[in-house]
């Protein structure tokens, strides 16, 4: 019987076809249309950002009280003829803002402010529709990654809550002798808008990388930078809310000087509340301070200085990261903070002229997103390569 000679270098099963490597359980278990959902979230992000800008312009043009009813569905159709316009104008003429601030306004002037508020509300309806179509579509196709549907559903729930808060805010300016909405309700409305925007941005950042990539990256996270950016998020959110309180009572127009406030560091009557005795133990006095232009403007400035100082200090720590992408994220954040400081000073010196004020608000959105981006890269760093020069 002949014995077949074999080389000691011959591989076992040389003729067999090698099996194709399979992904791990992480990649298999978290499938779905990650790229499609991310694009959908990015569209929602742009719409919410536009909503914040249009909302700011609606406030700056004193248009927010031009529609005196809340009709989420039927309100999507604006007045289409002279009779409908006259009826809508009559409703506005019954409001305190018309009687006390805009008496004698013409129909053409009313139409200009009406379109701002209608556009703001219509944009909200578009956001709701885009969310619903996307969520239900991905859900029906069973393309939502495992564990993600509660997060995406929560975005829609928060959007619905935001619509209700928007009307709650508007309603505060339609009673008594009010000509503007309550500043605290405005701050609640804007604060929730930034929360929604931040959640959308964070989910989009996560979906931009695979689950396995995120898991591996997290093993090299920089805990210190994660903590620092978390602190920065808190300070930035406080500053956003304070900015809304300033805007709600036009406090920026009463102190058009910098770095002083009409010649002093502490504005005159900073702790004065009409009709309420100054008492640190009295809650009514504390609430009344939120309507004091000098008090809220001073807090807004101090919070701005704090945010800028912390941001620049944290930038020094960010520059020490061994990951190039993380260092770049902190560089961008530092530059945005410097630009926002200039816009803030410009807003003060121009007595909150609308062009500068809206640029300042857009700057807040940019900084908010850049802080989240820096935190994301601190938590999930992109590992560079010496060979590719990406360290």
Swiss-Prot record:
Entries under InterPro entries matching the protein: COX15/CtaA_fam, HemA_synt_rhodobact, HemeA_Synthase_type2
Annotated Pfam families: COX15-CtaA
Record GO biological process: heme A biosynthetic process
Enzyme Commission number, as recorded: 1.17.99.9
Catalytic activity: Fe(II)-heme o + 2 A + H2O = Fe(II)-heme a + 2 AH2
The entry's keywords: Cell membrane, Heme biosynthesis, Iron, Membrane, Metal-binding, Oxidoreductase, Transmembrane, Transmembrane helix
Major location category of this protein: membrane
Segments traversing the membrane: 37-57, 121-141, 152-172, 186-206, 229-249, 298-318, 332-352, 354-374
Compartment annotation: Cell membrane
GO CC terms, sorted: plasma membrane
Mode of membrane association: Multi-pass membrane protein
EC class (word): oxidoreductase
Pathway: Porphyrin-containing compound metabolism; heme A biosynthesis; heme A from heme O: step 1/1
Positions annotated to bind heme: 300, 360
Cofactors named for this entry: heme b
Molecular function via GO: metal ion binding; oxidoreductase activity, acting on NAD(P)H, heme protein as acceptor
Family listed: Belongs to the COX15/CtaA family. Type 2 subfamily.
Functional description taken from the UniProt entry: Catalyzes the conversion of heme O to heme A by two successive hydroxylations of the methyl group at C8. The first hydroxylation forms heme I, the second hydroxylation results in an unstable dihydroxymethyl group, which spontaneously dehydrates, resulting in the formyl group of heme A.
Oligomeric and partner information: Interacts with CtaB.
Protein name, as recorded: Heme A synthase
Organism from which the protein derives: Cereibacter sphaeroides (strain ATCC 17023 / DSM 158 / JCM 6121 / CCUG 31486 / LMG 2827 / NBRC 12203 / NCIMB 8253 / ATH 2.4.1.)
């Amino acid at each position: 019987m002949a014995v077949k000679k074999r080389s000691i270098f011959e591989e076992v099963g040389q003729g067999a076809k090698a099996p194709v490597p399979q992904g791990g359980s992480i990649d298999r278990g978290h499938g779905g249309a990650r790229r499609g959902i991310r694009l959908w979230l990015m569209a929602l992000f742009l719409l919410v950002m536009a909503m914040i800008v249009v909302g700011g312009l609606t406030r700056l043009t004193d248009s927010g009280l031009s529609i005196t009813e809340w009709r989420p569905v039927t309100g999507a159709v604006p007045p289409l003829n002279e009779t409908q316009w006259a009826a809508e104008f009559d409703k506005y003429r019954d409001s305190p803002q018309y009687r006390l601030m805009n008496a004698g306004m013409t129909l053409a002037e009313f139409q200009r402010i009406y379109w701002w508020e209608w556009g703001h509300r219509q944009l909200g309806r578009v956001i709701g529709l885009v969310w619903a179509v996307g969520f239900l579509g991905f859900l029906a196709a069973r393309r939502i990654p495992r564990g993600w549907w509660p997060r995406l559903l929560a975005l829609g729930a928060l959007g619905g809550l935001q619509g209700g808060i928007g009307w709650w805010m508007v309603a505060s300016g339609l009673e008594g002798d009010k000509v503007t909405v309550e500043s605290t309700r405005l701050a609640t409305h804007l604060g929730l808008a930034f929360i929604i925007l931040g959640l959308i941005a964070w989910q989009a950042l996560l979906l931009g990388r695979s689950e396995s990539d995120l898991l591996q990256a997290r093993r090299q996270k920089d805990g210190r930078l994660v903590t620092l950016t978390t602190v920065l998020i808190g300070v930035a959110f406080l500053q956003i809310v304070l900015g809304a309180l300033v805007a709600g009572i036009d406090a920026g127009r009463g102190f058009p000087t910098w770095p002083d406030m009409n010649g002093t560091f502490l504005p005159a009557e900073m702790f004065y509340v009409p009709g309420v005795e100054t008492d640190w133990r009295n809650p009514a006095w504390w609430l009344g301070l939120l309507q004091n232009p000098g008090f809220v403007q001073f807090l807004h400035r101090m919070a701005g200085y704090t945010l800028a100082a912390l941001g620049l200090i944290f930038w020094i720590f960010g520059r020490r990261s061994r990951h190039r992408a993380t260092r770049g994220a902190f560089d961008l954040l530092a530059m945005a903070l410097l630009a926002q400081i200039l816009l803030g000073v410009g807003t003060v010196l121009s007595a909150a002229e609308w062009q500068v004020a809206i640029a300042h608000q857009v700057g807040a959105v940019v900084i908010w997103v850049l802080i989240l981006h820096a935190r994301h890269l601190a938590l999930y760093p992109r590992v560079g390569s010496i060979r590719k020069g990406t360290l």
